[in-house]
Amino acid sequence: MEDKEIGTPLPLPHSEARLQPTLVLTTLSAAFGSVFQYGYNIAVINTPHKVFKSFYNDTHFERHGTFMDESTLLLLWSCTVSMFPLGGLLGSLVVGLMVNKWGRKGTLLINNVFAITSAVLMGVSKVARAFELIILSRVLVGICAGIAYSTLPMYLGELAPQNLRGALGTMTEVFVIIGVLLAQIFSLQAILGNATGWPILLALTGVPAVIQLLSLPFFPESPRYTLIEKGDEETARQALRRLRGQNYNVEAEMEEMRTEERTEQAEGRLSVLNLFTFRPLRWQLISIVVLMAGQQLSGINAVNYYADVIYTSAGVDPTQSQYVTLGSGVINLVMTLVSAVIIERLGRRILLLSGYAICCSACLVLTVALLLQSTAPELSYLSIVCVFSYIVGHSIGPSPVPSVVRTEIVLQSSRTAAFTVDGAVHWLTNFIVGLTFPSIQVAIGAYSFLVFAGVCILTAAYIYVVIPETKGRTFVEINCAFAKRNGVEFPEEKEVATAKPHTPSLPTKETAF
């Protein structure tokens, strides 16, 4: 099949790919050994924080004969908490170099060094009587999480067939939440969240890393990376056959990747600095920044931080609030799985917009309930409903969907640079919220949730105006949709509209798509 005007062979129509065992197992191995670490280490120190502080204090007494004053203990604990997102930021800054040199799968495997090292250090910290090992390990496991959170969506997005790209893309957030939930379960006082069990609790972060080291080498590297960046067409074809099944015609997908490769030959590999000045990717880059900043600044971490106070004000016994928190974690996981099921039916935009609408409404009602519950105590129960509603809203859109969209709106040659920016924004905003929210909450109290409602409105407005629906489109077609907004001429746009499911060839030098 050939376009007579351009003389470029066009790819055959895509058939619907079915979910194959190899693709499922690759996803499980890659996700469990990577972003699971992110979720687990976010939550693992929250419930038993008094146990850790006691260890810090006892260690100080053994060394100096006196206990720490409250300000010193608070400073050390703040360092323990904040070192994780700081490590995540460091990891996100090196991920571009790693995935270009060692590939997506290779980067995930090398990344396990950070997880295993931190697990060993945290596991022996009690025997060594050195709380400093915990703080150092939080940096290392943060680096692991930062690398994983940028690499896994890239890997899964490039492994997935077009009709399953959304569902597989949400697995990044699904496994983050599974990590959070298991950490909440294991850190219960009756299990490992106690004075004797906490070293094991922290060291468990090494188990997924070992499992991945033993399993992931047997699964294929990203076919797009193999073909477009390494030029190894036969290995890419073999990988596609393993991922799609032997009865699937992989040639249409191979031709689509060749088309993408041709569009990028004039562009070359973009660095992070070049990305900021590259006109054809201007709105894609802005969209990535808005999606990741909106995800964090919309208040999910603040709601989790404030949840225990809300539960206590509603009459929940402080010793039982850990179980209410566990219940919210279950809701989070269930709704994220629902998002994974419906994303290819409803699309990305509707999940993002409806999710932000729910979050905004929950923040507004929560503000009113918190302000009035001193005069109307029954409103404290409404506060709990608002927390759970917020979690539902964030779980169906703002949490899982950006991982899908950020992979889809950039092409292969710019993806690593874009994900470096993406990861840096994610971890920096995460760090800012964790650092500033306690002070904001003290200063303005319940009104702090109005700030998050405003962020939800602004982010949703941007998505509505700027970000197109990406469901069912190839990577090249999605970038064509951004062309007019970027002020770039695409002579093939008419062909895309009239000749679907053909994928256009884009040889124009200026567009570099």
From Swiss-Prot:
Intracellular or extracellular location(s): Cell membrane; Apical cell membrane
One Pfam family matching this protein: Sugar_tr
Superkingdom of this protein's organism: Eukaryota
Keyword Glycoprotein: yes
Disordered: region residues: 494-513
Cystine connections: none
Annotated InterPro entries: GLUT, MFS_dom, MFS_sugar_transport-like, MFS_trans_sf, Sugar/inositol_transpt, Sugar_transporter_CS
Gene Ontology molecular function, alphabetical: hexose transmembrane transporter activity
Topological domains, Extracellular: 43-78, 129-138, 194-198, 304-322, 373-380, 438-446
Catalytic activity, reaction form: D-glucose(out) = D-glucose(in); D-fructose(out) = D-fructose(in)
Topology relative to the membrane: Multi-pass membrane protein
Topological domain ranges for the Cytoplasmic compartment: 1-21, 100-107, 160-172, 220-282, 344-351, 402-416, 468-513
Keywords assigned by UniProt, alphabetized: Cell membrane, Glycoprotein, Membrane, Sugar transport, Transmembrane, Transmembrane helix, Transport
Family indicated by similarity: Belongs to the major facilitator superfamily. Sugar transporter (TC 2.A.1.1) family. Glucose transporter subfamily.
Protein name: Solute carrier family 2, facilitated glucose transporter member 7
Organism from which the protein derives: Mus musculus
Lineage, uppermost ranks: Eukaryota, Metazoa, Chordata, Craniata, Vertebrata
Gene it is expressed from: Slc2a7
